[in-house]
Amino acid sequence: MPVTLIKALGLAGALAGLGFCAVCQAHEVKTRGLVLHHPWVHAAAAGAMGTDGFVMITNTGKAPERLLGATIEGAVDATLVRAVSPVDANALCQLENGIDIAPGATLVLKPGASGLLFGAVNKSLREDIYANGTLVFARAGVVKIEFYIQAEDSKAAKHSPAGAMAACLASATQ
């Protein structure tokens, strides 16, 4: 029995190494006092008005950091946004000054909260592949990453950059 278990674990490890495990799709980058956990975007066809991206960022450094922006190959640069309404997915406000990350803290960009709103998609972002991109920080500068492209979730918000900014401006004038 122990030999069978060892063989099974070895096979599981080999399959995981080849990408046969959903958990193995998660990836991270450690650099300049930051740990970037599983940056990802929703799949989008070329010509789409935009797509959204998410990541979890842990500041392991001793100084505060600030996320300022992002880029992805295949779409216009991102705008940092936060949701302002739990019932209206298009009610977003632009975070013009970025998002602070205190030393030892973790920033979670996730659907329905804060995220990256990429503009016009000029190259198909197909599901289950990676796209080159960057995250831009105040102290760490430009950090090269790969965004994993995931299917659009039926629960996830569908955004248009113009609609998001209009909603933000409308809420600011009330």
Labelled PLM ranges:
Residues 27-174:
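Compact, glycine-rich, soluble single-domain proteins
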Residues 1-12:
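Bacterial N-terminal signal peptides that target proteins for export
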Residues 20-26:
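Sec/Tat signal peptide C-region and signal peptidase I cleavage site
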Residues 10-20:
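Bacterial N-terminal signal peptides
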